[in-house]
Amino acid sequence: MLCFKEIDYFCNMKTKSEYIELIENQEDELRRGFGVRSLRLFGSVSRDEQTEGSDVDVCVEMEPQAYLMVRLKRFLERLLGCSVDVVRMHKHMNPYLLQEINRDGIYVIK
């Protein structure tokens, strides 16, 4: 398990490749600790359009447990050093959001 210090979420912008590498390096923890079956980056980071204030948008396939989702969000924010929005893939998703994920999404864990 990683140990983290407090983060200033608006000072640690990284490249798409850096975000991918950080997540890939924690694949075992994400699978075992959170039950993540797959994880995709989407949004501005996946399109290389992020700015200093951008968050990282992540779509995961995992069990619908609110507690795990909150823990996953906090884990990813500390790992990536920025604000993270986590959405869970499910069959009743907003079709516009699903379209964006399918269009721009980059599988980091598959």
Where in the sequence are the language-model features?
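Catalytic core of pol beta-like nucleotidyltransferases
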Residues: 1-38, 46-52, 62-110
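Short, well-ordered beta-strand segments
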Residues: 40, 57-59
